[in-house]
Amino acid sequence: MSDCSQNLLYDKFELPESVKMMAVEGSGGSVDKQASFIAEPLERGMGHTLGNALRRALLIGLEAPAIISFSMTGVLHEYMAINGIIEDVTNIILNLKGALLKKYPFQDSENGRCTQLLKSKVSIDASDLAACGGQKAVTLADLLQEGGFESVNPDYVIFTVTQPMQLDITLRVAFGRGYTTSERIVLEDKGVNEIVLDAAFSPVVLVNYFVEDTRVGQDTDFDRLILHVETDGRVSPKEALAFSTQILTKHFSIFEKMDEKKIVFEEAISLEKENKDDILHKLVLGINEIELSVRSTNCLSNANIETIGELVIMPEPRLLQFRNFGKKSLCEIKNKLKEMKLELGMDLSQFGVGLDNVKEKMKWYADKIRSKNGKG
């Protein structure tokens, strides 16, 4: 039986402070249907882990409404033609599949996620035909006369009429995920001449992700995740990403409930919270000025690391490459730096310090501090 009374302490994970959203080239700056999201830095391997999970959730997890069946005056089956309408029933069905309906089924809304019947009357007389040159297009907007559904493509043509007529049309709209074939849609109250359709519920059209290298300080062993999301306009890419994240969180929470020890992650050191002068005073300290064991001091000396600044800018894997530098010395140094509110692999670029000039810069800052204190 596991002892769950104490939390486990884990090293910090590098995480992005926020996710950056960018318009896609050629979109005119709009992010209504296409957008790219950039998250960095991530620990090595987490770019693909998150990218693949988000891609799958975006493609199969999001819900939206779609027309799952229809009936119309004079239509008995899907293989017939209708007198006075250019399109046959098969083409009308294909057009109905392209209808993009939008409605948020809020928890306290009247119908919620319930299937709805949308009934409409289409009346076309000779004057309507004359005004349109003899052919009157019936659009998606003409069929959405009730039900509270919006259409992203209201001018989308469903069929074209060539003679005066009156039609009663009923659309059955349901909420769902992904793509469902007509064979899998079961209607308990199906009408005699009601034709069931394949339904494309997902509002997400395309998802791609890419993983690139990025750096934290001098360490380049981190991931940058670039996620490209394209929707059909029923939800924005930003909404789609937010919804898919909640879906994944819901599923991961199942495994989090296992009765095991909890992990507490160490906090990353933020230089922004510290006074710049205070940080510099720590960075210019010599290695021999802090209380390290003789072994650790000698290891650093052999590696030609003389100041704290030279030490903290060094990535952890690089330290372990030095001769005789082992895990025990590494642990001691990390604990000592933590006491000083410092850590390995720090980004010192705000001080103009990099791996290529750290020795010179530490000497310059030390001279500057001594001069300021009247010890030059």
Swiss-Prot record:
One of its GO terms (biological process) is DNA-templated transcription. Pfam families: RNA_pol_A_bac, RNA_pol_A_CTD, RNA_pol_L. Residues 276-376 are annotated as: Alpha C-terminal domain (alpha-CTD). It comes from Chlamydia abortus (strain DSM 27085 / S26/3). DNA-dependent RNA polymerase catalyzes the transcription of DNA into RNA using the four ribonucleoside triphosphates as substrates. GO terms for molecular function: DNA binding; DNA-directed RNA polymerase activity; protein dimerization activity. Residues 1-259 are annotated as: Alpha N-terminal domain (alpha-NTD). SUPFAM superfamilies: C-terminal domain of RNA polymerase alpha subunit, Insert subdomain of RNA polymerase alpha subunit, RBP11-like subunits of RNA polymerase. Homodimer. The RNAP catalytic core consists of 2 alpha, 1 beta, 1 beta' and 1 omega subunit. When a sigma factor is associated with the core the holoenzyme is formed, which can initiate transcription. CDD domains: RNAP_alpha_NTD. The N-terminal domain is essential for RNAP assembly and basal transcription, whereas the C-terminal domain is involved in interaction with transcriptional regulators and with upstream promoter elements. It catalyses: RNA(n) + a ribonucleoside 5'-triphosphate = RNA(n+1) + diphosphate. HAMAP family: RNApol_bact_RpoA. This is DNA-directed RNA polymerase subunit alpha. The lineage of its organism: Bacteria, Pseudomonadati, Chlamydiota, Chlamydiia, Chlamydiales.
